Amino acid sequence: MIRISQLKLPAGHSKTELYHKAAKVLHIKSEQIASLQIRRQSIDARKKPDIFLIYVVDITLNGISEQNCVSRSKNKDVSIVTERPYQFPKPGTKALRRRPVIIGSGPAGLFCCYMLAQNGYRPILLERGKDVEARKKDVETFWNGGPLNPESNVSFGEGGAGTFSDGKLNTLIKDKDGRGRHVLSIFVENGAQPEILYEAKPHIGTDVLSNVVKQMREKIIQLGGEVRFESRVETFRTENGALTGVILSDGSVIDTETAVLAIGHSARDTFFKLYESGLHMEAKAFAVGLRVEHPQELINQSQYGTLHPDSLGAAPYKVTARTSGGRGVYSFCMCPGGYVVNASSEPGRIAVNGMSYSGRNGANANSAIIVSVTHADYGSDEPLAGIEFQRRLEEKAFSAGCGKIPVERYGDFSDTATTGHIPTEFVPAIKGQWTFADVKSVLPDSLSEAFIEGMEQFGHRIPGFDDANAVVSGIESRTSSPVRIVRDDTLQANIRGVYPCGEGAGYAGGITSAAMDGVRVAEAIASCYAPFSETGK
């Protein structure tokens, strides 16, 4: 197979033009190309208004020597490649006396369970929230002014917090073992868009993702796994430092010697109970901030130029800054054509997040602009002190908005005045009840100052970013877990048989990296144990 890199065509080109360009590079006719598979597609907008798409493509040929073709091309961007598909490890020999238990159905838990089910381990998946259909109803009720369900919301339920997000799938994690591409392939097998396999910044969208996780659940069941909703794990039962069972909130016990702890970063009650039970944890760096909304067209023109082609869709952005005081300020979970959503999971507290549908066709762009947090900000290096800091900020947000999402013009946030007025031509795109309020009162002064300094720097890179009519809302407090559950080289915690996993445990940041960690933990279990057999108990 021949791989061509840096294949450059103007945005809006046809499939035929892509074939012709590849053939020209190889000095052959396009009819001699048997197959062409896009491996990567990215946008080059450095020379606006001229916008280009940059490709990496894999090609097979009809009746021509690939090696001779590569040699004749005399092009450093043309090479012979051999596909190395992902390989799940051979099973171990140790007998499983009980079925493995997966705690949490976010990306980490779901993919861990999926891989184990595919390979004969018959896992039991426990999710404290509801299935995705019932969960969506609870979330819509809450957004429309109904009561918060602490067990079924944007944070808890089938698919985890990522179900109500933009569904971004890009990751910076090196993927020499092929886990990342395998994760994307599983998404596609279960209904995601095939384009996510090659787009430089792939995303699914909340509307598609909810169907994908449902299909994955159904396949797990077909493969001999079991999925139980509204099943919150309270703590572990142990003997001589090893796991013997998981104890649920209703007092029931599931006997097992293997449990994957993939509870997500919002299961604060579980963190505290497991810490009290002796599970080793440590504080981890994190960041907090606010959601910032702009007209999507402002971002489109900044990124793609005034006369940008519609085929490019809604433009994303990524910005970072370092303040004069040394703090990092950066965008997080940018949602083109998206919505700010009420992502609260605890009564008396407000947390926000961003969400986009697959079409990304909303009028506004939003992103969290977040500021790095240190131990000095919350005055303790205790493992769970970061959670308490997050809670205090969420309580301030709840108070500022009288139970609704507090919203403010950036011009008022960055000044001492509060007009409580947003121009009619720019309306916030928010899922959930919101109100004009003093958002600046939510953040500590040191973080507000860093936020403003970062916004000013971003305004130099994206004209209008720090415009007074941009809208801020808060608080974005759950960008990542403030806790890491310590695990060893076998991926187990100090309680043998417990496998901390995913973003909540401190080993991932986003859907794809969490799913990859779930696959990695499944590999660790499979490398040790033989597939589950009732007769082998």
Predicted regions and their residues:
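Residues forming the flavin
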Residues: 1-53, 57-537
